[in-house]
């Protein structure tokens, strides 16, 4: 049987391993821009439609079930949730090597319109104005593909010159040949987008597929000049 320590050791030996070998913790939820942690360490953010599987993907990346709260209710994540390697507070003078940011889902939420509008403003302000944001991982449900609202978010990222990469989630829910075709089709859809990273990554949080590739991509994003 593989233990958590065994899995961590195995991750350490892979391209994305060293940043993910240490346990990760939640440090704060950010309901408004004024509550953001000090700028300094590089950040990568996870964006996508509500219920696309952001929290499950983050849990899979760091190998810790339940770190990012998952829910069957779309729109449950209402803040920018910050996660860092254990041993850092995220405060000035005790900054981590990097941070993962789980963003509120867009496109649907079981909440009053005013609240949804506030989340939307927070997300857009963060994407446009966070200097330490190195890359956004835009999550797309493999069963549904890119929707109009995803294209609107890509338009925003392109106009703000924020680097982003498409990550297909729940790839285990469709057949393998369909995944290969979807990766190719998605790559073609973003080829002319100026801020889009050309490589599309297919993942399954449930099966662990594509997670090591995504870890390596994150490490490259935060360490490349």
UniProtKB/Swiss-Prot annotation:
Cofactor(s) this protein requires: Mg(2+)
GO cellular component: cytosol
Residues where Mg(2+) binds: 55, 77
InterPro entries membership: G_ENGB_dom, GTP-bd, GTP-bd_ribosome_bio_YsxC, P-loop_NTPase
GO molecular function: GTP binding; metal ion binding
EngB-type G domain sequence ranges: 40-224
Binding site for GTP: 48-55, 75-79, 102-105, 169-172, 203-205
Gene3D superfamilies: P-loop containing nucleotide triphosphate hydrolases (3.40.50.300)
GO terms of biological process kind: division septum assembly
Keywords per UniProt: Cell cycle, Cell division, GTP-binding, Magnesium, Metal-binding, Nucleotide-binding, Septation
UniProt similarity note: Belongs to the TRAFAC class TrmE-Era-EngA-EngB-Septin-like GTPase superfamily. EngB GTPase family.
Summary of the function given for this chain in its UniProt record: Necessary for normal cell division and for the maintenance of normal septation.
Protein name per the record: Probable GTP-binding protein EngB
Organism in which the protein naturally occurs: Chelativorans sp. (strain BNC1)
